[in-house]
Design a protein with these regions (language model features):
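Residue-level hotspots at or immediately adjacent to binding/recognition sites across diverse folds
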Residues: 3-5, 11, 17-407
Length: 407
């Protein structure tokens, strides 16, 4: 799961529209009553959306599912003050991360659901199925786990602590004590370890396809983070085959090993997308195929602090890609890729939209996109608009669904 509200934008190169390129209508999904912030993280082929919203401004996030009409439906937690949902699959099942009522182990801040580092409850991976939330087991000795995605077979991917204390964890992952590894749960709830690459000690799985192939990253606890502006990061992008054997997906051409490379999504053809750090320190989206290896599919030059480039979140079974970018001032922008080039999704929606789209998190095989948007009316009146150049001044964000339409 792309935890927590890691929504992103960047100013720079925008691509001219091709005549056959779709435009989009946008539906505002709102937030829970009393809340001011929501995000859509997954959308299935029926147009159902999962994500999370707060119940009060600044309050903890709570999982939701939206069935294409009506309000957001709240999904309960495992007893703690927060949760977030990914998926859903074709059957409406969702991958959940949920806080429990237990205090954090050794003051760890593994989840990012309820507040500042060191002020966390235990969190566990769970699955929402047939109207019930069921906790999934951790690896032996682990206290915390997270989910990121699930497939139509009911397999869920994420990562779990494994009970091994590592004093180097606090260097790369503040408030983390135990190592963690990528895992697959299910389809019957059992947990299976996804071992990191040889020489690595930690890892996480971010995506899975309907063939049971999973993707994510691995590294050392000293250079792997469980959370950050773009989610967890580690040096090596990894593809795990159905039998759990890992493959190193490499790095962008000309970039030395050791910077982060994160695989986020894999479609049923085995194509993988993610983000990687380039030699100039900027972040670039990538597409990996078995035939071509890792290809750079666009960066936004000009934000030389290492944050000013796109992140690919999801690739669907037709090869469409969505994501987001962030500029040097931490302003976010939703992206969709056309011909391997990132396009600002805001240029493809009605100009008078009340929303400014800040993050494209997922899309289905019909090209519908969900993510997060700023409510323009929650921003002060400035020139240029605050929703583009000073987003921290805006006070309300909503989940959205963008549906393609052709001229």
């Amino acid at each position: 799961m792309k935890l927590i509200l890691n929504l992103i934008t960047a100013g720079s190169l925008l691509v001219a529209l091709a005549p056959a390129q779709p435009r989009y209508t946008v539906a505002d999904l709102g937030a829970f009553p009393g809340g001011n912030s929501s995000a859509g993280y997954g959308i299935n082929n029926a147009g159902w959306v999962t994500g999370c919203s707060n119940l009060t401004p600044g309050g903890p996030l709570q999982s939701f599912i939206w069935y294409g009409i009506g309000p957001l439906i709240e999904i309960p937690t495992l007893g703690g003050p927060g949760g977030c949902a990914d998926g859903p699959n074709a059957f409406g099942e969702a991958a959940i991360i949920s806080a429990t009522s237990k205090p954090p182990y050794m003051n760890e801040a593994f989840c990012g659901l309820t507040g500042a580092s060191g002020d966390q409850n235990q969190c566990l991976a769970a699955v929402w199925k047939n109207g019930r939330l069921t906790a999934l087991p951790t690896l032996p000795g682990g206290h915390n786990s997270q989910t990121y995605w699930l497939n139509n077979l009911g397999q869920v991917v994420g990562f779990s602590e494994n009970g091994i204390s590592d004093p180097t964890c606090a260097t790369g992952t503040p408030y983390q004590v135990l190592r963690f590894e990528g895992v697959i749960w299910g389809p019957d709830g059992e947990v299976r370890e996804l071992r990191p690459l040889e020489g690595d000690t930690t890892g996480f799985a971010w995506g899975i396809n309907d063939h049971g192939q999973a993707v994510g990253s691995s590294g050392l606890c000293s250079n792997t983070s469980v959370s950050g502006p773009v989610g967890p990061t580690a040096p090596h992008a990894v593809l795990w085959d159905r039998d759990g054997s890992p493959t190193d997906l490499g790095h962008l051409e000309g970039v030395p090993a050791g910077v982060y490379n994160v695989a986020t999504s894999i479609n049923d053809r085995g194509d993988v997308v993610g983000f990687a750090q380039a030699s100039d320190g900027t972040q670039h989206g990538f597409l990996w195929t078995k035939e071509t290896g890792m290809q750079d599919i666009g960066g936004f030059p000009g934000a030389g602090n290492g944050t000013g480039a796109p992140c690919c979140n999801t690739i669907n079974n037709t090869g469409e890609i969505v994501g987001f970018s962030i500029d040097a001032n931490f302003n976010f922008r939703a992206l969709v890729w056309q011909d391997k080039m990132p396009i600002d999704l805001n240029t493809l929606i009605p100009a008078d939209s009340p929303l400014y789209l800040t993050g494209s998190e997922s899309l289905n095989d019909s090209g519908q996109i969900t993510g997060t948007a700023i409510v323009k009316s929650s921003c002060p009146v400035t020139t240029p608009p605050a929703w583009q150049t000073n987003q921290s001044l805006c006070t309300e964000t909503h989940a959205f669904v963008a549906t393609p339409c052709f001229p």
